[in-house]
């Protein structure tokens, strides 16, 4: 190989390496963005679950009070 061919080959290899590096950085940036989006969704789901827990507890408390009222009425009728 003469000197010109070596320079061209070197330029092609260097250019390919730089393009591959840019592609990898773009992919890393996209993955980072995806991770941030998923983290935000996980936080929102966690907040939703916590809100549901308090709603479920309130429903259980209401059901327990309703059952107690029914039990009291049944006891009065049976007396």
From Swiss-Prot:
Q: Which residues form the signal peptide?
A: 1-21
Gene Ontology molecular function? lipid binding; peptidoglycan binding
Give any single GO term for biological process. periplasmic space organization
> What's a Pfam family in this record?
LPP
Q: What is its main location?
A: membrane
Family note? Belongs to the Lpp family.
Q: What is the name of the protein in this document?
A: Major outer membrane lipoprotein Lpp 3
Q: Which gene encodes it?
A: lpp3
């Amino acid at each position: 190989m003469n000197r010109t061919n070596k320079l061209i080959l070197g330029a092609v290899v260097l250019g390919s390496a730089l393009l591959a590096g840019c592609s990898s950085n773009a992919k890393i940036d996209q993955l980072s963005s995806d991770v941030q989006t998923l983290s935000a969704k996980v936080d929102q789901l966690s907040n939703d679950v916590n809100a549901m827990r308090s709603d479920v507890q309130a429903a259980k408390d209401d059901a327990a009070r309703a059952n107690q009222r029914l039990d009291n009425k049944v006891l009065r009728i049976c007396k």
